[in-house]
Amino acid sequence: MFHIGSLVVLCGLLAPTTALLEALPTPLGQTLPLAVTPALAPSPPDLAGSLTGALSNGLLSEGLLGILENLPLLDILKTRGNAPSGLLGSLLGKVTSLTPLLNNIIELKITNPQLLELGLVQSPDGHRLYVTIPLGMILNVKTSLVGSLLKLAVKLNITVELLAVTDEQKHVHLVVGNCTHSPGSLQIFLLDGLGSLPIQSFVDNLTGILNDVLPGLVQGKVCPLVNAVLSRLDVTLVHSIVNALIHGLQFVIKV
């Protein structure tokens, strides 16, 4: 027969044993109840780096550098130069000395294209993101006017606006708003420093043409790639970014 006194002794023995078990660490792979360790929402500091990293990797995977390197830049310049209208046609109409300059260029090739570190800025209201895509490249120029090969360093920024929009089915998407080259961001300079007066004059004239043509040309290649990359981003990352933009949460952006 099980006596009450025995029950009291048994309970007394179990009490310290239970306390010891509770003090033991949780085995690996075992999740504690939410009441003990409440789940934390993804923090904005994680989003900025994750987004720029995903966009950068995506652009490289889409072949951005190869696309830039294979641009038929000289053919495009000569085609537009012969056209009676357009920015370049207007420029050549005003400065007729540029026509023989184009005709005397034997080769104009992009080499060593680079995608530099992406930048990220948030709008003051917190509902939009602006991604800066900085590009660098070298222009190899051969011309009958100059005996040696000229190397021009080129830098250009493309700015992409990202925002959250709601469709007719009330689904929210992360989309590209404006995508354009940053005004005044194009930099072209002679890698070997200042050349002789004829060489520097040639570089200045060529720079004037490239200022009107190159930004729009590069923009036309980069912006469609951004759309393609955006459509393939990790769903969880997109959801977190959209949620932050809708609520105007400030991203912590490391400079």
UniProtKB/Swiss-Prot annotation:
Any one Gene Ontology BP term: negative regulation of single-species biofilm formation in or on host organism
GO cellular component: extracellular region; extracellular space
GO MF annotations, alphabetized: lipid binding
Pfam families, per the entry: LBP_BPI_CETP
UniProtKB keywords: Antibiotic, Antimicrobial, Disulfide bond, Glycoprotein, Immunity, Innate immunity, Lipid-binding, Secreted, Signal
Residues carrying sugar: N157, N178, N205
Compartment(s): Secreted
Signal peptide feature range: 1-19
Species the sequence originates in: Bos taurus (Bovine)
Subunit details: Monomer. Interacts (via N-terminus) with SCNN1B, a subunit of the heterotrimeric epithelial sodium channel (ENaC); this inhibits proteolytic activation of ENaC.
S-S pairs: C179-C223
PANTHER family per record: BPI FOLD-CONTAINING FAMILY A MEMBER 1
Name the record gives this protein: BPI fold-containing family A member 1
GN (gene name): BPIFA1
Stretches the record annotates as Important for surfactant activity and antibacterial properties: 87-92
Family from the record: Belongs to the BPI/LBP/Plunc superfamily. Plunc family.
Tissue note: Expressed in trachea, and at lower levels in nasal epithelium.
UniProt keyword rRNA-binding present: no
Function recorded in the entry: Lipid-binding protein which shows high specificity for the surfactant phospholipid dipalmitoylphosphatidylcholine (DPPC). Plays a role in the innate immune responses of the upper airways. Reduces the surface tension in secretions from airway epithelia and inhibits the formation of biofilm by pathogenic Gram-negative bacteria, such as P.aeruginosa and K.pneumoniae. Negatively regulates proteolytic cleavage of SCNN1G, an event that is required for activation of the epithelial sodium channel (ENaC), and thereby contributes to airway surface liquid homeostasis and proper clearance of mucus.
